[in-house]
Amino acid sequence: MIKISQGGGRLLVGALTAMLIAACGGSSPSSSASTPSPTTAPTVVTRTDSAHGTFLVDATNQMTLYTFTHDTPGVSNCSGQCLAVWPALTVPAGAPVKGGAGVTGQFATITRADGPLQVTYQGLPLYFFHKDVAVGDVTGVYPSWVLAKP
């Protein structure tokens, strides 16, 4: 049994408290803990099915991606009502844009006339189709709209 004098008890409690705070990382915030590192997860990945082969999908929600034959590299020609039917794949400013395994082409972003940054693949803007509501849906293939392929 350890006998602690009246003044020594306060000293021991203070020392134990300091050790506990130090063991828990201290009370001052760490700059690395408060600054999130940018994500390096892919923006676009591939999906394969027997009817369409391998095509691009959004990495977050796995929805099918399309390109518009009336677009030119670096320019979206889909605006207004077109965007209601064919929403653009957009990212926040500064977000990294890259492909997952099996996607070897070049990704970039363009600033749309309405403001957002739209993801491009091989220079062509990428879009969703509003009637694709479930993972694996590929209902947006039309003469002017084609599956985005790696």
Where are these regions (language model features)?
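Hydrophobic core segments of beta-strands in well-ordered, beta-rich domains
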Residues: 65-68, 127-129
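Acidic glycine-/aspartate-rich tracts in secreted/extracellular proteins
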Residues: 69-74, 94, 131-135
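A low-complexity, Ser/Thr/Gly/Pro-enriched, surface-exposed linker/loop concept
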Residues: 75-107, 144-149
